[in-house]
Swiss-Prot record:
This is Undecaprenyl-phosphate 4-deoxy-4-formamido-L-arabinose transferase. It catalyses: UDP-4-deoxy-4-formamido-beta-L-arabinose + di-trans,octa-cis-undecaprenyl phosphate = 4-deoxy-4-formamido-alpha-L-arabinopyranosyl di-trans,octa-cis-undecaprenyl phosphate + UDP. It is found in: Cell inner membrane. It comes from Shewanella sediminis (strain HAW-EB3). NCBIfam families: PRK10714.1.
């Protein structure tokens, strides 16, 4: 049975990092798309420690008469997912939508997510149709999608697309999780009973630079695998067992060749042995790296430092009273 609670209020959460070039267009297009829904809404913009003029643009937008914009200013850069979690702490909506600030995913798709959620889904994901990224972005992303899907067991076709919709109870459940490393789409699907995906348009980035280069994608893959599953550790044990078995068989094979061809064969085979030895040493370092990732995350969790620090919350006078009233009801 699907969740059929009405959606009367929509919160749109957008993390912002050095996006002053695209912010004016983002604001106008997102507000226009939200107006077209015919529902109450708010636009929550989180400045994730930007070094440009992004925070000032957000402040000006929140200060406009009858503004729907809420600005959350973090004291430094904490990363995309932590910034979104900071936004989740201050939303009021029945449905919460996340969106990147680069305009590659059009804000005009927001009403489509709301319509799909109103069919009774707790979480609505998106799949980018005809991606406009370079091959260096597309192919690593496809590889990461396949690896993460196999490792986590979560059925999602496009982990990198942050244009998504979540019911309020899913967001509330995520806020009760306190791990330092969080990947929101996978975490949300763990609390959503009914999930769906829709196709969305994808555009080229017209202004600014992508915050995810090739190495960032590799780091993201490690974050995904080590923060959501212990499958890499199990795989490491399997690979280690396979290497050990191969080593034993290869040793027996060398003994057999030595018996057949004599002691001189062993001298001639020194360099192949060194090559194989380096392969084994490399495998050990990979394993140590994975173990280090997990130990490092345990260390971060034990320190229990906050995932982010909100320096300021910018709310216009028109919406301040409504937010105070809602907070009093929730308390």
């Amino acid at each position: 049975m699907k969740h059929n609670q009405n959606i009367d209020f929509v919160s749109i959460v957008i993390p912002v990092y050095n996006e002053e070039a695209s912010l004016p267009e983002l604001l106008s297009r997102t507000l226009a798309a939200a107006d077209s829904m015919g529902k109450h809404y708010e636009l929550v913009l989180i400045d994730d420690g930007s070094r440009d003029n992004s925070a000032n643009i957000i402040e000006a937008a929140a200060a406009e008469p009858d503004s729907h914009v809420v600005g959350i200013i973090l004291n430094r850069n904490y990363g995309q997912h932590n910034a979104i979690m900071a936004g989740f702490e201050h939303v009021r909506g029945d449905l919460i939508i996340t969106l990147d600030a680069d305009l590659q995913n059009p804000p005009e798709e927001i009403p489509n997510l709301v319509a799909k959620a109103e069919e009774g889904y707790d979480s609505v994901g998106t799949v980018r149709r005809h991606r406009q990224d370079s091959a260096l972005r597309r192919y690593p992303s496809k590889l990461i999608n396949k690896l993460v899907k196999r490792s986590t067991g979560v059925e999602m076709n496009d982990y990198g697309c942050m244009l998504r919709a979540y019911r309020r109870h899913v967001v509330k459940a995520m806020l009760e999780c306190h791990e330092r490393s969080t990947f929101i789409p996978i975490l949300a699907n763990g609390f959503a009973r009914h999930t769906a995906e829709i196709d969305v348009h994808h555009s080229e980035r017209s202004q600014g630079e992508s915050k995810y280069g090739f190495m960032n994608l590799i780091n993201l893959m490690f974050d995904l695998l080590t923060s959501m599953t212990t499958a890499p550790l199990r795989m490491l044990s399997i690979v280690g067992g396979g290497i050990a078995s191969f080593g034993i068989l290869f040793g027996l094979f060398l003994i057999l060749l030595r018996l057949i061809y004599g002691a001189e064969w062993g001298v001639d085979g020194v360099f192949p042995l060194f090559s194989i030895l380096f392969i084994f040493i490399g495998a050990q370092f990979v394993g140590l790296g994975l173990l280090g990732e997990y130990i490092g995350r345990i260390y971060s969790d034990v320190r229990a430092r906050p995932r982010y620090y909100v320096q300021d919350i910018l709310v216009g006078e028109a919406t301040k009273g409504a937010r105070i009233s809602d907070e009093n009801k929730n308390n």
